[in-house]
Amino acid sequence: MSFTPGKQSSSRASSGNRSGNGILKWADQSDQSRNVQTRGRRAQPKQTATSQQPSGGNVVPYYSWFSGITQFQKGKEFEFAEGQGVPIAPGVPATEAKGYWYRHNRRSFKTADGNQRQLLPRWYFYYLGTGPHAKDQYGTDIDGVYWVASNQADVNTPADILDRDPSSDEAIPTRFPPGTVLPQGYYIEGSGRSAPNSRSTSRASSRASSAGSRSRANSGNRTPTSGVTPDMADQIASLVLAKLGKDAAKPQQVTKQTAKEIRQKILNKPRQKRSPNKQCTVQQCFGKRGPNQNFGGGEMLKLGTSDPQFPILAELAPTAGAFFFGSRLELAKVQNLSGNLDEPQKDVYELRYNGAIRFDSTLSGFETIMKVLNENLNAYQQQDGTMNMSPKPQRQRGQKNGQGENDNISVAAPKSRVQQNKIRELTAEDISLLKKMDEPFTEDTSEI
């Protein structure tokens, strides 16, 4: 006896926009294109999973009994815990709850700026022995296939489930038994980006769909609304960003004005909350390096947390809990040196701490961490020594290379004997002149 999902206990089937057999119909799994009349537009046929053109995506060759699960975060794995992952279907016993999820690589679309954007994949469930991998055994390692089965199912035999005929059987909203953990970064089509609690999801979708039915019934001859899918949301978001000129692919240009604003914003924060970067250097945030602030040198003082080597050091930074509970703390009142004399003085306190960060050679990236620490610990001492060295004499403009050592000698006028401050003895002539200066002056009245 073959089983047909959704043919039994229709009252427990997911509520919503019900068609003849009480099963939801989804835009990505509809069998025929319906003509939808819209205001001022030509009728557009709905695209199904089999009618989509393979522009950067594969075509789903078979119809799944269930709505898909769409990925909305990159880098997230599609996986379920053992014994989980098979959707609930009225009329299908637990012994037949076995199959696989098939990854549908969706199409790409062109954004407003002319770039192609690839949509994240969507997964569809097929019972064992049906769908695109009907001839493959359970557990076969296939790219884009994830095998699931309940604990009561025998995975050595195919499921006794009929293939879905889209002309008579419509897609069932995907629901899971209580306790099923939905993969992180994925959401079930038609349920929003919600938690994996299938019952609450079903009730929420039931209330939303019934409210939508009442609004359509009250609208009279109002034209029916078209279905909104996550694909449309992605396209709308890209168009809005392009219209506003906020393309995420283009780096934001930092001008002098914006750099000044960023620096002022950082300096307005309390000292312990500042994060130095290219716009606000380490010295601007925390002052010059010295015995009490002895970390940082070279490029790290210029780039701060933007330095490529800083993230690996940040792994050593203690958490807030480790800071308070793993350190020796001391509260001290200090003199307030900020503010004008006319302003009321505030009480200023310092929470002084003393602790240690312990790590060993088994830490990931140990060699790199030691290299960065050795380069930046007490680096100010080497910098001070470099600054105290006499600068290299610079060649004057217009002077050619290869001249002798005399080129670097000063050409200033020689100093006089007085400037040289040399001691010499008086001669007889000097003594005679000094005596004449001491004699009284007499006017010569003789006539020539």
Swiss-Prot record:
Sequence ranges assigned to domain CoV N NTD in this UniProt record: 61-190
Region (Dimerization): 266-384
Region (Disordered): 1-55, 158-231, 383-420
Region (RNA-binding): 52-194
Compositionally biased tracts (Low complexity): 9-22, 193-223
Cystine residue pairs: none
Compartmental location: Virion; Host endoplasmic reticulum-Golgi intermediate compartment; Host Golgi apparatus
CoV N CTD domain mapped to chain residues: 259-384
Post-translational modification as stated in the protein's UniProt record: ADP-ribosylated. The ADP-ribosylation is retained in the virion during infection.
Subunit structure and binding partners: Homooligomer. Both monomeric and oligomeric forms interact with RNA. Interacts with protein M. Interacts with NSP3; this interaction serves to tether the genome to the newly translated replicase-transcriptase complex at a very early stage of infection.
Name this polypeptide is given: Nucleoprotein
The encoding gene: N
